[in-house]
Amino acid sequence: MNIAVVDYGMGNIRSVSKALERVAPRAQVEVTSDPGVIRASDRVVVPGQGAMPDCMAQLAASGAREAVIAATRDKPFLGICIGMQMLFERGEEGDTPGLGLLAGGVPRFPAARMAGLKVPHMGWNQVRQAKPHALWDGIASGERFYFVHSYYPAPADAGLVTGTCEYGVSFTCAISRDNIFAVQFHPEKSQAAGLRLLSNFVQWRP
């Protein structure tokens, strides 16, 4: 099995690849921006951390943008943090166009609703499973995962919502559709629960 971890110069790429190697020691995990490698892989992971305008610009500059879009159509696909946000139509940060694969936007946590909570949302928080999914196998609803973000996805289609979290507001932190699963939290930083989710992704047959 070949797993492509898309490298477009933003964030936590190596920690994601190391976590995948740990849960799938027999897999070939390749950190790459090569469109040919991405298209030839069996599974694709798009991590990312930072500002959405920078991430979208870097993805385009890397040459991997179209290969990532193609992967969302026909391969098991995992988006992490910005890799989740970019699937939507537009990010509030810099009024940035996303890939437009999913209807909805990416707003900032509303200051009026935060009641003294700091933004960015940084640290451990509970994830409530909104519906069953193969990637939740062996993970309890309410399990804690690690977050670092100031913006969150707001899907137009409530049917996409697969996990939610509370931080001043209730927000979507996991979505799924067909071969796509994406999370706002960082499984590679989330210890046993995060490794279980990555292991489930490696074994997933959508």
Residue ranges of each PLM-predicted region?
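Cysteine-nucleophile active-site neighborhood
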Residues: 50-122
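Short hydrophobic segments within beta-strands
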Residues: 6-8
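Short acidic/histidine-rich motifs immediately flanking catalytic phosphotransfer sites
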Residues: 38-48
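Extreme N-terminal starter segment of soluble prokaryotic enzymes
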Residues: 1-4
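Short acidic low-complexity segments
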Residues: 29-40
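Amide-donor transfer/coupling interface in amidating biosynthetic enzymes
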Residues: 105-206
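Short helix-loop-beta junction
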Residues: 19-27
